[in-house]
């Protein structure tokens, strides 16, 4: 190798086959660390002593020439490898046992079993973060602040104080965000900060993170800080805060994504954006990962494609740095990267792998990243055995291993068949990573993404510029905020592209398919993947077959509406009304012309209602009616708004619960959608639809007992059918409808959307008057409320109604009634096939 690439060039030969000698010891340590933390101490000691004795005996016997009987006849390298596996397993068992004992040691676990109220002095070990909003029944569970910490001192109610070092998860009920206090004050805390908190200890969940207990804290007044963070964490905090300030003026997606992509700050990531990244298997880009460090090191030491060589590319030779100086500078960069980005599994893996590679670079020797990766895994699981059970760590290692082992061969095969080199490398990398990671993702999500590979290909081109410009903004923010804002603005273009790829991919009707969850499902998917890879090796020799299969896959992902209707029969031609299957909640659609539909309620989760509207072909919503503000009717609002033109939102005037009402106002204001109040007597028409609002009253509202009493109720006419939609009206309000001047119009409706998910609280007189031929109930499978109530179903059937429910029958579509009037008109109902 000539010296054309700069000072310090080291002659190297052609790289040989990958060195796999460290792989078995690393896997043995990983498996042992994953299996032994919860083992009884005696069993752990037995494993350690047994493996240690066998390993030492094998090494000693090999040197003396008297090998054990089971090892005789084996070559020296095999005996050494077996000994290394045994010794690494012993070390991992010892480390896992000590860490497990550390969790169980001290008074915290016993206090947690007694649900004791204590005052602790604790040191933060990670950045505080917000829990994700969850719908529980008709309310959204309060968002809490989650804090990983290490308890240094615990004081019991009797005044007894004990020193300890127990890891805990603090769940802080800090109320709503408030400048200078409450939730905001907790979220500003930095790792290594020491604070005092009073709360109730409860046992940690089995199989969760490595914690001795959970401490539930009421922290509305803010944290009580005992000691501030370390100097390194203060510097990292200033840098991260500077990046947030530099990105404040960016568009929504780039503002949320850029801090996460650069330093792992995901505080601005919305649940909707998070779901889009999960649906497209782009979560490794949502937060900082080892790829970020790879990009930075590549700028310094050269491109990753030369990783097997002591290359002299990048900025280092142009700055006149020697080989060892380059390694030292890269090591300092790696350490700073881990501190600023926090030691997440992927970051730790990348840092350890990079450190081993840098040591090889400093000595000027040949290196291979496969042993570097194996060494990283070995060191990390010995240092922190909890990583052995981390899905993030597993995905990170699998993806890196696929890129090192599978991708080069696949790339070469693609190049031999005429694929351009750059495209072949990118395609092989995406395919290899997806092949090995998909089974693990299926364990977590019970779903397989069909758009992961193209989305990763499209996003990958933007990762490097977004990362480099983002880190430049991070470094310049403390000294020149205007320059940092300019750099962040430049970075917002590639970051916005990544977010748009995720949203577009997730919005495709066939973006993913349901798959059996758990490890049995993972094994099944792994078997299918192996079969596809083996078949693919034969298919690449037949371009026409490849093209045909590609077209079929494209059709399965895009699912054109005419083709989908022919294949699945959904939605049925001429449908008038559809009830979406959104679990324990309500979301219904009234057809209002080609691609248009009036949506009544949005369900408890954005994904199901978005999927339902997509399958129905709804792209325009002339009106979205939210009958009341319970979470099981409005929490899915962003799913209705996703990628659709929504002209207006109409709601009840009773704005409780306040949290959900504020959520609706905020989302509507962000998209400039007018919000109006529905009042009894209001009549509207759009396309083939005509409806009148029956409730709530137009005059001064009565003293409602709760949001259900203020539900918007509608009487709808479409295509000769009459539908009565009752929201969640309670019996007193149903009785008030019977006393209204136009109550006679409620008689003999074709379709009844049963109030309150078919609960037992129904007015029998209204059911008898309505006398529906079809009664539809929206409820969730196995819901804790017993919906629908057997007496309600019995009363409806006694009146001659066909009763269908989403928990058993899935999504439902109603048609018929064209050109007919009166009791003889036909009502057709279609169930969506799973």
Feature-to-residue mapping (PLM):
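Transmembrane helix-bundle segments that form internal channels/tunnels in multi-pass membrane proteins
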Residues: 5, 9-105, 118, 402-578, ...
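Residue-level signal for inorganic ion chemistry
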Residues: 32, 122, 392, 437, ...
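Short hydrophobic/aromatic residue motifs in ordered secondary structure
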Residues: 35, 129, 137-139, 144, ...
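Non-globular, low-confidence helical/coil segments that flank catalytic cores
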Residues: 17, 184-187, 270, 278, ...
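Hydrophobic alpha-helical transmembrane segments in multi-pass membrane proteins
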Residues: 270-452, 517-564, 569, 650-653, ...
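Membrane-interface helix/helix-cap signal primarily in integral membrane proteins
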Residues: 1-23, 66, 70-284, 515, ...
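Aromatic-rich juxtamembrane segments at the membrane interface
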Residues: 2-34, 207-350, 578, 600, ...
